Amino acid sequence: DSQSVKTTESGGPSGYDAGKKVKGRKRHILTDTSGFLISILVHTADIQDRDGAVDVLKRICQRFPWLRHIFADGGYAGDKLRTALAKAGNWVIEIIKRSDKAKGFEVLPHRWVVERTFAWLGRCRRLAKDWEATVASSTAWAMIASIRM
């Protein structure tokens, strides 16, 4: 899943996420089924979810070759991600979508785990807003915050 975060005037790369109306950076995370952080990728917010997911999967295919099943939200649906998964390995992606009949908030299976991880990261004051000048330091602070989970 991904999270768009506002940046400060400290500089560094930032973009505009038109869907969430946020100028800043986007964090893509991959968690295990317990919600513990496996991988994080931070980049400008103007990159779509399905495009950022390809970069996340490229980073983890060597480190975690035993992964087989990936759950994702509707923002990751599309042929681009399925093609990247086919090239990277023998992975199955399951898109968890909201039902058309749902009104308001609905807890979705498997997706709430990632949202809970974002909430855990959001409890860290340094991660509530992206204060860092570089993407590398922004990634590092998120990894440091995940140690206490």
Language model features by range: what are they?
Residues 1-90, 97-98, 145:
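Polybasic low-complexity intrinsically disordered regions
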Residues 83, 90, 95, 104-149:
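Basic, amphipathic alpha-helical segments enriched in Lys/Arg and hydrophobic/aromatic residues
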